[in-house]
Amino acid sequence: LVVFVGAILLTFPLLAEALPGQPELKKQGTAQQLFVDGKPFLIIGGELHNSSSSSLAYMEPIWKHMQELNANTVLAGLNWELIEPQEGHFDFALVDGLIQGAREHDLHLVFLWFGSWKNGMSSYVPLWVKSNPQRFPRVVLKNGEKREVLTPLGEASWKADAAAFAALMRHIREVDGKQHTVLMMQVENEPGILNDSRD
């Protein structure tokens, strides 16, 4: 089981008006507490390896294993290249399958968005981003060395990432806005550059 600390974002307050019972953080004395369907909810979570959730077939035995561990929530990565394989064309079959798998096993989900960065690298961006460094520029270190990491200074990059993330959030709200299988979304994962501090 994984204890996790970090910047997490509740999914549905980002999108227009609140839905009844949606996951939310409430101040309880001096602490913040997660509430789901109006009741306190303690996450007992198991976090998957980076790409484990990229295959529904691979996930089949994992759901049962999480139940055996008495977990109530699975932390699973969603990578941009599988969500938007072609610019502006989204494939949410994996997202839907993960939500369905969690529901079938009485589990909740916390998704981790592997967008522009994952562990200081840009490994999970779509091919249409990887193959166009003119439009989606890369980091240049102070010694002049170039890295295959998207620069945070590239407007086209962050706009494309934001558009994909917004489409994903809208889809999750459409398919899960009433059932609250998805509790939270981590926005990006370890953004930055390995072995240097900035572009």
Language-model features: locations:
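Hydrophobic faces of well-ordered beta-strands that scaffold small-molecule active sites
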Residues: 44-46, 74-76, 109-112, 183-187
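N-terminal carbohydrate-binding accessory modules
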Residues: 17-71
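Bacterial N-terminal signal peptides
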Residues: 2-13
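Active-site region of glycoside hydrolase catalytic domains
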Residues: 104-107, 117-199
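The substrate-binding groove and active-site-proximal loops of carbohydrate-active enzymes
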Residues: 45-55, 77-95, 142-163
